[in-house]
């Protein structure tokens, strides 16, 4: 069953025209969760589809260097457009950079994310880089869990997906 699902996602979740995985079958939209493809071991980081997907996320979901979850304008989620960047998703980009060998960019983005913490080290769910303020739930455990995981990943010689399946 696992192999069938994997094959189905690779066949139907990858848009050949966009040259990347997409948010949902038949969609042309991206979602930051696509940054997890390699870190969870779904596909290796050196797979051309993974690299192309990471690059597509960078082109389409980065706002002032931080990652939006998805483009709210192209989405039918009932939320108004204009959310901030999701901090957990920005930590996922750090992990993705690590996995594809862009370690300096990973460290720079990680340092930038750390600098967003408040005076007692807390992070919100989102950050608005234009207004330079935290948004959403505060404090947000998901942001902090992502920070801890990413710090751990940056400190190891073996990167996240290399540990999967052991």
What are these regions (language model features)?
Residues 3-86, 108-159, 163-166:
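Extended glycan-interaction surfaces of carbohydrate-active proteins
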